[in-house]
Amino acid sequence: MAFTYFFRDLQTLEMIRDRVLPAIRTRRFIHIWDAGCAMGPEPYSLAIVLRESMGYMIFRNVRIHATDIDESGQFGDIIRKGVYPEEQVKRIPGPIFDRYFSRNGSPKHYRLADEIRNCIDFQQHDLLSLKPVRSDLSLVMCKNVLLHFTEEQRVEVIRMFHSVLVEGGFFVTEQTQKLPAEVSGLFETVVSNAQVHRKRSGNA
């Protein structure tokens, strides 16, 4: 089972906060796809950062669609409960932890606030099916997944992501994952030293 931590990639979260959020925060509905979410710390970390930056009223418009192939069949239950052991939450800054977590009945386990849990929905999903979760996404985040695919598969999946982003939507992947040449023209790079890309105008 994939074991991940909250706030594991703080640099990417800060990039989304500083470079992506200002461009999408005024939209009536903000749909985000976290493709390859594992046990949930990544989409929940993103939700916390967005809530901190947006405030309650705007954050109500956010929906994060978290998906994973989840061969264990256990991720959905973990994400829906929103209960995590101490070792997974220990990197969260103290004030943020105090705002969004409370002690659970189990020793050294903590439960996320309903406000954060309620903005996430989980689906078991295989990216290679090339079937998107929806077609009006402001942001697609896919980290540590594409590296497991062949170059041809990566191109197909990124084309699928591109097709479901709204005009000016964003695609974020890990820093070591460069865009294949076949799809690089579909996006403009927002941050030169990070894999934050924006759908080019006129590219349907």
Segments (PLM) and residue ranges:
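Conserved class I S-adenosyl-L-methionine
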Residues: 28-45, 64-65
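Short conserved AdoMet
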Residues: 25, 84, 166
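Extended basic-aromatic, gly/pro-enriched interface segments that bind polyanionic ligands
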Residues: 56, 60-141, 145-149, 153, ...
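Conserved beta-strand signature within the Rossmann-like core of class I S-adenosyl-L-methionine
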Residues: 167-175
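Conserved AdoMet
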Residues: 1-33
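A short glycine-rich, Lys/Arg-flanked "PGG" loop and its adjoining helix->strand segment in the class I
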Residues: 155-167
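Conserved SAM-binding loop of SAM-dependent methyltransferases across substrates and taxa
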Residues: 39-57
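Core SAM-dependent methyltransferase catalytic element
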Residues: 139, 180-204
